[in-house]
Amino acid sequence: EDLFRRLGLSVDWSLLYTTIEDRSRRASQRGFLRNLARGEAYTQEAPTLWDVDFRTAVAQAELEDRDRPGAYHTIAFHKSDGSGDVLIDTTRPELLPACVALIAHPDDPRYQPLFGKTVRTPLFNVEVPVFAHPLAQIDKGTGIAMCCTFGDLTDVIWWRELQLSMRAIISRDGRIVSEAPSGLTDPAGLNHYASLVGKSAKQAQTSIAEMLTAS
């Protein structure tokens, strides 16, 4: 208020309010109850930014981009008809159990014959569909990417727009959950997954890279 007065702002101070006062809270609560009565309020399963150390949601404004060492891993998905493999490059092999689809650009002739078909994930033998989407980058890696729930914002967009399955494998503490994701029924795949349970994402990344190398 002092700053506003010194700046000479024309303000009706009788209308002053704060966002945490009783009047503001009542107005907010009434507004929500009105939306609920109209059927405009709903619950929905959706991803969020999460801090695994403090166990709390994180605002976009709190994020910082940092460079760190990484590596591309080339992973072979097996065509369901047995006609060969589809290679993808990823820096996040630990998300392989959370893979729900492969995505390529609709104009990429290399993968157009695959659209609408399925492939199987290595190690876990889960069948996933192959889709076309304009956000896929033809000139990045092999030009086809795995969509996992969730590695980045692009995964979220693909998951929503293509109405993909949810296979969340990382718990609130940042470790691999004990319950195998949906679709994983292969005995060998279940054994591979069991070896990851309780590991951090970084530990799981190393383990899956080693398993892929040995397979």
Question: Model-flagged regions — what are they?
Answer:
Residues 1-3:
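Short, charged, amphipathic alpha-helices and their helix-cap/turn boundaries
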Residues 6, 10-11, 15-17, 21-179, ...:
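NTP-handling and nucleic-acid-processing catalytic cores
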Residues 182-202:
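Acidic, Ser/Thr-rich peripheral helices and adjacent loops at domain boundaries
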Residues 199-215:
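Phosphate/diphosphate-binding loops
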